[in-house]
Amino acid sequence: MKFVCSLIFIWLSSLTIFANDKVLIDYSVADSLKVVNLLEAVKSIGSDEPLPVFFGKQFLGVPYVSSTLEIGDYERLVVNLHQLDCTTFVENVTALSICVRKNYSSFSDYCKILKKLRYWGGEIKNYTSRLHYFPWWGLDNPKKGFITEVSCGDSMFSATQVLSV
């Protein structure tokens, strides 16, 4: 009987873990507080500084570490603001900027945006559903309305410049 009760408890606990959009989120309390504090701090900046610049500056001095999203045997949303690589830096700065533009101020809102940015179609299925490379990131996120492609169109821009050396 004790064994059956334990199994039921574990099953109910797992429902709670996956209840929020069926996503397990791996984060520290320090990282969740940092998100909320950054979303609060941005309210005091002037309108002259672009949001991505403001948030990017907040990560100066954060160590560059690779493979910070590879935790455990299954894919989950990882929030790690105390170690970044090139892609996670851009993802975090972008997610924070989008939160401000949408008037979001909670860690939960931030996680929803981060999940949409980081995964094909905004859905976590497995390791292969993560946008591992910037070209992939640039293909999927315009469809979500998060970024806009800026290009020269069909013709390449060319100009002649004379240098005096």
Where are the regions that the model predicts?
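Bacterial Sec-dependent N-terminal signal peptides
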Residues: 1-22
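Generic hydrophobic, helix-prone segments enriched in Leu/Val/Ile
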Residues: 2, 35-38, 42, 114, ...
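Cationic-aromatic interfacial patches
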Residues: 21-88
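Acidic/His-rich structured neighborhood in mature extracellular/periplasmic domains
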Residues: 59-165
